[in-house]
């Protein structure tokens, strides 16, 4: 036990010790230690999680005869329910693709897809892809390289040097990057993919689904490249106010995943009740255009104000990094903002590169411009 204790002491000395906070949620506010704070760290981008009207409308449609609260099994055994297929068909239809497949979480999706599909393959991943994608790459045991962040000339060089050595190549990226809030150029990635044989594009839209595109289908919809992305992954646990994840892809890839993806095969499926809620929200996704427009106005204002103070602004989205550099300064500023009534959280290495500790600000559509202006005055 002494070795574990020393590890924790070392983390504490480096200002990298983490703990799970005791929180009470009140709409867009957080109660912690008897302090009420506006939640500036939520991924509930459209503000749907606290929308009581939506919740009541969903519950009323069942009249007390709710779907099961557990699946009790893997979908490949006895845990499949009609609502799963209904949601997969709806997702595939909205994206105008052959098929969709559900997962228990975005993490499950990202650690399972690549190991299931990448035998004798090369993986080329953006340097800043999410930890879950890195874990999936490691589990695949494939040869892999990481290209410099959003540097497609570097990616092209790696493709030219390596593609002929492998049966298949997978380019892996996020569309909206979770810590910097910047956006991948999906059109350019599609063009690159098409230049090389047996090359597949895998895009994680976790922070884009619901928020971008005319119908809320993400950056791929906005860039008009949905049909060109081989594996388009998204989560229901952020803007869509639910849980779980999906991939849209060709039917043949779906069948391969069903047969070879261990997190899918060996996990108890999501509760049908939650999948029904996801269906309810996803069905209404095109209706939230006002929320998307309002969120963009709030985001543009906050990005401008933070850039004015730090001279650093990689973001193009509602994820706005307030980069302070060192751990101590970041922890102190987060504490100061919490004392002023704003629930802001410090993000430190190894989540972000050393020397780029920041407060990750994420806006939601249920905030007002006055609230954001009042927050800016505290920066």
From Swiss-Prot:
Keyword set, alphabetical order: Biotin biosynthesis, Pyridoxal phosphate, Transferase
EC number in record: 2.3.1.47
Residue numbers of N6-(pyridoxal phosphate)lysine PTMs: 238
GO BP annotations listed: biotin biosynthetic process
Recorded metabolic or biological pathway in which this protein acts: Cofactor biosynthesis; biotin biosynthesis
Molecular-function annotations in GO: 8-amino-7-oxononanoate synthase activity; pyridoxal phosphate binding
Pfam families assigned to the protein according to its UniProt record, in alphabetical order: Aminotran_1_2
Catalysed reactions, semicolon-separated: 6-carboxyhexanoyl-[ACP] + L-alanine + H(+) = (8S)-8-amino-7-oxononanoate + holo-[ACP] + CO2
PROSITE patterns per UniProt: AA_TRANSFER_CLASS_2
Gene3D superfamilies linked to this entry: Aspartate Aminotransferase, domain 1 (3.90.1150.10), Type I PLP-dependent aspartate aminotransferase-like (Major domain) (3.40.640.10)
Cofactor (UniProt): pyridoxal 5'-phosphate
SUPFAM superfamilies hit by this protein: PLP-dependent transferases (SSF53383)
Residues annotated for pyridoxal 5'-phosphate binding in this entry: 106-107, 178, 204-207, 235-238
Residues holding substrate: 18, 130, 351
Keyword Transferase recorded: yes
PANTHER family per UniProt: 8-AMINO-7-OXONONANOATE SYNTHASE, CLASS II AMINOTRANSFERASE/8-AMINO-7-OXONONANOATE SYNTHASE
Classification via NCBIfam families: bioF
Subunit details: Homodimer.
Family listed: Belongs to the class-II pyridoxal-phosphate-dependent aminotransferase family. BioF subfamily.
Task performed by this protein: Catalyzes the decarboxylative condensation of pimeloyl-[acyl-carrier protein] and L-alanine to produce 8-amino-7-oxononanoate (AON), [acyl-carrier protein], and carbon dioxide.
This protein's name: Putative 8-amino-7-oxononanoate synthase
Organism: Haemophilus influenzae (strain PittGG)
Gene: bioF
């Amino acid at each position: 036990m002494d070795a574990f204790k020393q590890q924790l002491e070392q983390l504490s000395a480096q200002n990298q010790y983490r703990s799970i906070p005791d929180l009470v949620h009140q709409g867009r506010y957080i109660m912690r230690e008897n302090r009420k704070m506006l939640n500036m760290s939520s991924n509930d981008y459209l503000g749907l999680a606290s929308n009581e009207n939506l919740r009541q409308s969903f519950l009323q449609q069942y009249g007390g005869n709710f779907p099961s609260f557990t699946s009790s099994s893997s979908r490949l055994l006895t845990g499949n329910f009609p609502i799963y297929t209904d949601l997969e068909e709806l997702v595939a239809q909205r994206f105008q693709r052959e098929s969709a497949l559900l997962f228990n979480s975005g993490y499950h999706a990202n650690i399972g897809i690549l190991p299931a599909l990448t035998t004798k393959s090369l993986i080329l991943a953006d340097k800043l892809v999410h930890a879950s994608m890195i874990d999936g790459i490691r589990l695949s045991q494939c040869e892999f390289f990481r290209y410099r962040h959003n540097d497609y000339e570097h990616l092209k060089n790696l493709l030219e040097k390596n593609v002929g050595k492998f049966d298949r190549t997978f380019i892996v990226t996020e569309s909206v990057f979770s810590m910097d809030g910047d956006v991948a150029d999906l059109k350019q990635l599609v063009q690159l993919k098409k230049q090389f044989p047996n090359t597949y594009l895998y895009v994680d839209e976790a922070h884009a689904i619901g928020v971008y595109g005319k119908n809320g289908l993400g950056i791929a919809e906005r860039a008009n490249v949905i049909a060109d992305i081989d594996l388009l992954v998204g989560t229901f646990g952020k803007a869509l106010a639910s849980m779980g994840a999906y991939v849209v892809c060709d039917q043949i890839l779906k069948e391969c995943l069903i047969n070879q993806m261990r997190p899918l095969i060996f996990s108890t499926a999501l509760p049908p009740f939650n999948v029904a809620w996801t269906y309810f929200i996803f069905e209404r996704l095109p209706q939230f255009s006002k929320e998307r427009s309002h969120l963009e106005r709030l985001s543009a204002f906050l990005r401008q104000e933070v850039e004015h103070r730090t001279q650093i602004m990689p973001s193009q989205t509602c994820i706005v990094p307030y980069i302070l550099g060192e751990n101590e300064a970041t922890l102190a500023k987060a504490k100061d903002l919490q004392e002023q009534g704003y629930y802001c959280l410090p993000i430190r290495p190894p989540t972000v590169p050393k020397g780029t500790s920041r407060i990750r600000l994420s806006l939601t559509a249920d905030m007002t411009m006055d609230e954001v202006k009042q927050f800016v005055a505290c920066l």
